[in-house]
Amino acid sequence: MNANVSKLLNEQINKEFYSAYLYLDFANYYAAVGLDGFENWYRVQAQEERDHAMLFYQYLQNNGEGVTFEAIAKPEWERGDHMTPLKKALEHEKLVTASIDAIYAAAYEAKDFRAMQMLDWFVKEQGEEEKNAADLITKMELFGGDSKGLCMLNSELKARVYTAPSLVL
């Protein structure tokens, strides 16, 4: 495997675990303010991010590459209103998308077709992640502070269940 692609994949493991930490912090915020549906949404999101990290880990292991673990940074964000985590999540997903795209570009340059094939799944996944984050913001904006709308959305988000990724390495 190309050394740069391996390095970037190793770094992505840390970024995915950071994403899980960030989303658990959002879940913790929503639990503290009594929005258990939002808490559930971000707890499930944290599970997804953890699994993304493990997919990168497994890909590197399957290809004879060592994995280097770095410290996971503490999530830093300013608590504000209930919209703050939603906006921060969209901003964060855009950063993750840029990171995946950079790994894909490096794999393309190195003609690492197996890595590109694996990354195809993540490119599609990131499109879904950004759309989901943007959709939550849109729904919150539609309510315009209406508590009934917030309760309805909270109930909707409470129904989300975790589904393991479909990528097979």
Residue ranges, per PLM feature:
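Iron-associated oxidoreductase/ferritin-like identity signal
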Residues: 1-169
